[in-house]
Amino acid sequence: MAGASTAGATSTGGATSTAGTTSSAGTSPTAGATTTGGTAATAGTAATGGSASGGSTASGPDQCKAIGWATRASRTGGTVSVTGGGDAAPIVVTTFADLSKYASDGQARVIHVDGTLGNGWSGNTGDRLEIKSNKTIVGLRAGTQLKAAIHINAASNVILRNLVVRGPGSNEDQAWDNLNIEGSSKNVWVDHCEFWDGQDGNADVVKGADTVTFTWNIFGYALPGHSHNLSNLIASSDSEPESDGKLDITYMFNWWKAAAQRQPRCRYGQIHVVNNLYTGDDAVGASVLGVSNGFSCNVLTENNHFINQGQPIDLGKQDGPGSVQQAVGNLFESCTGNQKGSGTAFTPPYEYKSFMVPASEVQALVKKRAGATLASPTACP
């Protein structure tokens, strides 16, 4: 079949992609940085995160296993395994047409993306990748680029890894996001990807989606002169009844770079924001608001490192039932606005503390490992 090959076969027609935005290890926090809200847990030994285990080393969890909310059936349900395409024979795709065909069909698939695929998009026109249930889509090597907006709608058991998605630059037109997860989608794990300069958002989760985990990703902006650098929206309206009791999301070991707001900005869900790095870049645009509350959103903001953020803890609109943001163990450096939470958040129903690191270790760890840095589809650095 054109543009695709099974595992072990040599595929043709795809250009070898260049290395992506692998970042060097960061430095320790500078003198004068402050930590507030309690003590930070130290890195520990092996742990499980539901039936998809999250075993750890001294430098974080096993990076080939899903952790967090993606490993739960629901807010009150038990554990599940996030397997994506499972044991299906990998297919190597070298054209966007083949990637789109396999990603949107009804079979379990493991899809390895080879080369730079897609022709980009603008507004609501161009290449858009529709992903259905039981799919693993992973870049074949570090820096694999996808020039297409990604849409996961009413799909479950999806793994997306090791891809760089670059948008055309943010704008006010409410156009496609780099990644949009919606419509009863659940058990989605997004890992070691990069989302840059999304039009409306970099990676939004809305309209009844649930049990999603983001690990080791970069959500960034590199194009100056754009006014809508609003990265991660959770629910698009206070009037979104299909999201009530859903939109439970974990963000762990991610890096927000030069985002103005929505890091993330939430409604409805139980949101766990832990061990993430936030860095502002005034040359691209001011980072105004960090983790933001909205209608009926319950947030645990834990052991993160905020650098050059206007208001890292944004209590925002704490209206609706159960709206709180508890901030604990965070590190603030060159931040001017609010750094304190309000209320007591939910208790995450999954294991994570044994591989959570202190906020003082987040910068070096995340700068070294976040992004599309995996040398192969099965790499676990």
Task: Place the predicted regions along the sequence by residue.
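Extracellular beta-strand-rich solenoid/capping regions of secreted or surface-exposed proteins
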Residues: S100-V110, G118-V138, T144-N162, G167-S185
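Boundary/junction segments of secreted and surface-exposed precursor proteins
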Residues: A58-A70
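Ser/Thr-rich, Pro/Gly/Ala-heavy low-complexity intrinsically disordered linkers and tails
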Residues: M1-S59
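Extracellular beta-strand/beta-solenoid scaffold signature
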Residues: G123-G126, K147-A149, E172-E182, D197-V206, ...
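Right-handed parallel beta-helix
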Residues: N134-A142, S156-G167, S185-Q199, A209-R262, ...
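Acidic Gly/Asp/Thr-rich repetitive segments characteristic of extracellular carbohydrate-active
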Residues: I67-H112
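Extracellular beta-rich repeat passengers
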Residues: R265-P381
